């Protein structure tokens, strides 16, 4: 497989520069006859989830294609679903660089990107141009300069705009890189947000005559009590799914490694066990009342099976995709 050679070259570069270079090349082939250069044949293994039919259970997690620039090229690699974003109502540059770090020895990444994106309107134009045959999820967040108390308005603005174009909508309230965002996961703030989102979903369902499911993405850094409360809120508000988990602030598994002290969210293999534990506990609490999309450190067939055994109906990859390449998609779908 060619990817080890590509990876070796890319890993000589700054991580964000490598990402930009890769996406520049993918944009050139996306939606063109040159897509065959990245296409691979992946078995069809249909999964029904959130009322949708997925051609296979392996998806791309949000954060890689924030602006939906390479949907078709990524789709050609065999993903059953792709989640673009996180996107915000207005464009924003994100946090200062450098803001992305490879923990190569641990096959992890630390990012403090800060929802850098070109805004929801730009994303929609890119989605309109795409021809991806799988399910497209759109992940939404709030702008950094929107006060947390008014944060729900940003989610509602985004929902209003993306609803006709989304297969499902992911509500990101768990990024550690937007100040105050994670506070929306708790108590009255969560109930208030979920009630508003559910009302908006009902309104948009009637307006567009189609039902677009909503999933909420949660953090791994939750106590058992917090997890139980979140599960209860999701069920009470009839949310359609939960994505577990986002990146972690915990550094216990990468102590002493290069960049371990960098601020931001840690993903990849060091997150694997904790995210699986959260999925397992969530599954016990939810008792099948809403499905779980499992994400966090999936870099092998074994890791994917562990997520599904813990209770995930679908899985997503990101860091594992960076470290292992497109072959990981085919490998998991074939052997899961």
Swiss-Prot record:
It is found in: Cell membrane. Binds 1 FMN per subunit. Its cofactor is FMN. Keywords: Cell membrane, Flavoprotein, FMN, Membrane, Oxidoreductase, Pyrimidine biosynthesis. It comes from the Bacteria. GO terms for cellular component: cytoplasm; plasma membrane. FMN binds at residues 62-66, 86, 139, 172, 217, 245, 268, 297, 318-319. InterPro entries: Aldolase_TIM, DHO_dehydrogenase, Dihydroorotate_DH_1_2, Dihydroorotate_DH_2, Dihydroorotate_DH_cat, Dihydroorotate_DH_CS. The active site is at residue 175. Substrate binds at residues 66, 111-115, 172, 177, 246-247. Pfam families: DHO_dh (PF01180). It is an enzyme of class 1 (oxidoreductase). Pathway: Pyrimidine metabolism; UMP biosynthesis via de novo pathway; orotate from (S)-dihydroorotate (quinone route): step 1/1. NCBIfam families: PRK05286.1-1, PRK05286.1-2, PRK05286.1-4, PRK05286.2-5, pyrD_sub2. Monomer. This is Dihydroorotate dehydrogenase (quinone). It comes from Yersinia pestis.
């Amino acid at each position: 497989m060619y990817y080890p050679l590509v990876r070796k070259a890319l890993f000589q570069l700054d991580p964000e520069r490598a990402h930009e270079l890769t996406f520049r090349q993918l944009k050139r082939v996306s939606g063109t006859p040159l897509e065959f250069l990245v296409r691979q044949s992946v078995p069809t293994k249909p999964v029904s989830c959130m009322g949708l039919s997925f051609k296979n259970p392996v998806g791309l997690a949000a954060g890689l294609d924030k602006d939906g620039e390479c949907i078709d090229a990524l789709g050609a690699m065999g993903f059953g679903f792709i989640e673009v974003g996180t996107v915000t109502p207005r464009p924003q540059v994100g946090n200062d660089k450098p803001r992305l770090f490879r923990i190569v020895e641990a096959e992890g990444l630390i990012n403090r990107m800060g929802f850098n994106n070109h805004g929801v309107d730009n994303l929609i134009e890119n989605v309109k141009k795409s021809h991806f045959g799988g399910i497209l999820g759109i992940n939404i967040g709030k702008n950094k300069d929107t006060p947390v108390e008014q944060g729900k308005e940003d989610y509602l603005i985004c929902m209003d705009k993306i609803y006709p174009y989304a297969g499902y909508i992911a509500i990101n309230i768990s990024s550690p890189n937007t100040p105050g965002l994670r506070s929306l996961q708790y108590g009255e703030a969560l109930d208030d947000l979920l009630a508003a989102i559910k009302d908006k979903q009902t309104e948009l369902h009637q307006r567009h005559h189609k039902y677009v499911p909503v999933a909420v993405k949660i953090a791994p850094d939750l106590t058992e009590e917090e997890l139980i409360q979140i599960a209860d809120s999701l069920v009470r508000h009839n949310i359609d799914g939960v994505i577990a988990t986002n990146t972690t602030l915990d550094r216990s598994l990468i102590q002493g490694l290069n960049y371990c002290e960098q601020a931001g969210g840690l993903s990849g293999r060091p997150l694997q066990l904790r995210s699986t534990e959260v999925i397992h506990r969530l599954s016990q609490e939810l008792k099948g009342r809403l499905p779980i999309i499992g994400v966090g450190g999936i870099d092998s067939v074994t890791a994917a099976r562990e997520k599904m055994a813990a209770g995930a109906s679908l899985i997503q990859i990101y860091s594992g995709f960076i470290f292992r390449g497109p072959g990981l998609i085919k490998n998991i779908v074939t052997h899961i």
